[in-house]
C-alpha cells in the first residue's frame, strides 16, 4: 500500500502544467500575431487602462500587484520555465501543443527562438507607484519593447500579465472603498479608534483558487490589518519587503467555528462558553460564533451569567453572529427613524409634554389627530394626540395645534428589535464618548462576517450612528462574495497598443470602434500615441497623442509612469508600509 501511494505521488508530481512554458500561458490567438503584425514592426507601446467602473461609488482604481507580477512571474517563472530550459525542450513542448490544437503555421517558433537566445524579456514596464489611486480611463502602466524587432512580444504578454494583475487591483480598489466608509463613520462616531482594524478578510474558502485568495487578501491588507487568510501574509513578505515578526502585516484572532460549539451538544452549550472563557482562553482576544442554536439566548442568558469572568479577563471577547440579516442582527430591526427620543422625558411626563410642547417640536398636518412613537429605555410608546376643534373670526371651523387629549399605548421593545450592540450594552454597560456616541467596555464587542457587502456596511454604520452607537462596537468581515464576485470587466481593464515604430517611422495607433456606442460610453476607444500621466489635485489624469520627442520636453519630465522593470531586471522594490502610506496619505 505504501509503495503504491508513493508511486502515485511521484506520478502526479511531474505534471506538464507545473513546468509550463510561459509562452503557452496565453490565449490561442496570441500565437499567430508575430506573423500578422504590420511588416517591419520594430517597436510597440501599449497601455494598461481601467476603461470603466461597474462598482458603485468608485471612480478611481488602486495600483497594486505589479511588484509581485514582476518578481514571481516575469522574472522567476520565465527564468525557470523558459530561459533556463534547453531550447530543444521549449520548442518541442510548444510545437507539440500548438501544432496539434491550432495549426502548423501557428506553431512557428522563429521569434520564440530569438527571445530564448536573448536570455531575458526585452521589455520595459513603466507604472504609477503602487498604492496610487488612478482615475478611470487613465493608463496605469505602459509596456514597450527595448530591443528592435520584439514589438510582437509587448501584447503577446497581455494575457499572462492580465490574469495575474487585474484581480489584486480590483480587490485593492474594493477594500479601499470599504475603508472610505469606515473612515467616514469613525470620524463621526469614534474617538481614538483604529480604522485599519475595522474590517477583516474572510474570503479564502470562497475564492476560485489559492493564488486568487492570496492576492485578494493581500490587496485587502493594503487598507486593513485583519485577515483569516494566513498565506496572504507570506505572499506580502515574499513580494513586498515586510516581516510579520517586526510589523503588522496582517493579524488574526482566536475564533471558534460551529463544529467547536456543537461538539458540546445543545445541552452543554453554556458549559462550552464557560469553558472557553474561563479555562481555555482566560486571557487575550477570543471570537465566539454564537448562533449555533439560539443567538439571542446567548446574549440575554449566557453572557449575563458569565459577566464577571468576561469583565476580569485581560482581553476582548467578541460575539459573532453568522445568520440572518446582518443589519438587523447587529443594529436591531427597530430603526432610529421609527421613533423619537426626548431628552429627560419619563413615562409620567409624556402626556404633559405632548399637550404643551409637541406643537413646537414635531410636525402636524392639520388633522384631528397626530401620532408619534416615543422611545424611553426599552419601551416604545404609541402616542395619539387629539387636537382642539375651533373656529376663526369668520366662523369657519378647523383643528388647531392645541392638544386636548393624549392617549398612550406602551409595549416592550423585543430583543430582535434592540439588536446585538444594545443587548451587549444592557449586560456590560457603556460609556459615552466625546462625540456623544455609546461605547462598549474594551473587554466585550461584536463581530459579523457574513454577507457584509459595500451596501450593508454603509447601512450598518448608518443605523448604528442613528442610534448614537459608535461603529467601533462591531468588527465586520468581508467575504468571497465581495472579493470573488468580480471580473476583469468590473473595472474594464485592458492592454491596448497606441504607438509604434514601423520601418524607422513613428506611428500613433489607436482603437475607436464605430459600433462601441453602448449607453454612449464609447469605453472601448483607446488612447492614441504616447501618454503623459500627471496629478491634478486628487485626480490622476493623462495627456495622449505625444511622440518620443515630445516626452523629452521639460513639461513632460514628471511623468507619473516610472520604469519598474527593464530587460529582465526589477528597478524599484518598495515595501508594504510605503505602499500603505501612499494609499492612505500617511494615515493607514
Indicate residue ranges for each PLM-predicted region.
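Low-complexity, highly charged intrinsically disordered N-terminal segments
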Residues: 44-107
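C-terminal helical cap(s) of enzyme catalytic domains, especially alpha/beta-barrels
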Residues: 335-343, 403-420, 458, 483-523, ...
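Hydrophobic, secondary-structure "cap" segments at the distal end of domains
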Residues: 387-392, 399, 486-549, 554, ...
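Buried, small/hydrophobic-residue-enriched core segments of structured protein domains
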Residues: 2-57, 61, 94, 106-122, ...
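Catalytic cores of alpha/beta
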Residues: 452-466
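Extended hydrophobic packing segments that form well-structured cores
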Residues: 3-63, 67-68, 525-588
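Glycine-rich phosphate-binding active-site loops on the catalytic face of alpha/beta enzymes
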Residues: 467-493
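Structural preference for beta-strand elements that scaffold enzyme active sites
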Residues: 285-287, 316-320, 443-447, 473-477
